[in-house]
Amino acid sequence: MATQEETFKKLVAHCKEYGFVFPSSEIYDGLGAVYDYGQNGVELKNNIKKYWWDAMTMLHENIVGIDASIFMHPTTWKASGHVDAFNDPLIDNKDSKKRYRADVLIEDQLAKYDEKIEKEVAKARKRFGESFDEEMFKQTNERVKANVEKRNALHKRFATALNDSNLEQLKQIILDEEIVCPISGTRNWTDVRQFNLMFSTEMGSTADGAMKIYLRPETAQGIFVNYLNVQKTGRMKIPFGIAQIGKAFRNEIVARQFVFRMREFEQMEMQFFVRPGEEMKWFEYWKEFRLKWHKALGMGDENYRYHDHDKLAHYANAATDIEFQMPFGFKEVEGIHSRTDFDLSQHAQYSGKKIEYFDPELNKSYTPYVIETSIGVDRMFLSVMCGAYKEEVLEGGDTRVVLNLPAVLAPVKACVMPLVKKDGLPEKAREIMDMLKYDFHTNYDEKDSIGKRYRRQDAIGTPFCITVDHDTLNDNCVTIRHRDTMAQERVAIDDLHTILSKACNMRETFKKLK
């Protein structure tokens, strides 16, 4: 059986082979941590964005969307705190010359303790069977107790160092835990230092008159500076939200794990404006709703979990992540934050504008508090691909690679195939494709054997293959083959639209969010 690392490498290769993701500028040997989405990748990505956008703006009558500019007045980023506080703690290994985020090295060490604990629990569960009491085992097994104690002690030191921004303590933790460089295997570390993540450029025609501006590191600020515009023109009443999908840019020194951490990425963010004092109620609401949204895709409830922050951002009074089980461990795909009134108050201070809301029920004005949901499109894309990628051994020893993608997200919903390239079958298949293509992304394939064509569609996650044979010309029926089960059934051509609609329409998925 392949290790998780080997499976992940196969997935990355699969993404390139089947037109999901390509290295950017590959003819020039590529550009580090920059990727292009291919013909199937862009369809999957667009479907993810539509699933999010509709869940926000269609299911919630008090949420509207905007599309703010990437370039913003530079004072925006001074007000938001990004100029002074948007940093990562970095450390170098003197032997390998490689640079790492100090906090990530320590988080990986915490994960190793968790893995040791889970390994002991798994062995005991297998040994004792149904009579196994996991909690009692954790409380009494000496090896588990020792690892729990080490983990808790490390977690406490780590949280304290982060909250105090104590770079010396972060390095000391790395030394005390004997964390080695993955490349050199040595513990020859430099001091930890802060590095600002924003890309800057200049706007203007001359060097003397140019203004220093930034590529936005997040989409949220475009929402905050448009709060008054949207609230007034939309006659919005508290509570209400503003949603946005757009590109953001961060000069990540340690960009890694394929599209998980990139320098150019896409965000789906929603800022929800509420009365001060009600923010925790809405924080819990969005925390629950967003997890439901992920689980509704059917990628396995056990693959999701919450992770509360050890250190809160400068703007937050509560924060949690929704993590997905990637081949390289549980990793964040979405963050839910209670941002208080920090952003609106800062922009009011720096702009000199009054940014408030008059509440007719309370008969007073106030600066709203904000609950944020922020999800990375690229991380969501990767989580879906990781959850869907399967290598199966079939009866008779044959194998197949299949993407068990949720039908609502699949790049192609159906592929229409004539059994042979003659006898009027291609013409009939084209007729069926023309009938479906206005409502569903549909492919046509007549090359190679029917078995090879099935495998090609399995590899890109197409839920249905529709085969036109000689009987079709007489009975107006086709064979529809289901991707996950490979089961085949004979159905009337007139029923195809209904079958695909039921499986691929987001309405059925949205019902799970109630």
What annotation goes with each model-predicted range?
Residues 1-514:
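NTP/phosphate- and nucleic-acid-binding module
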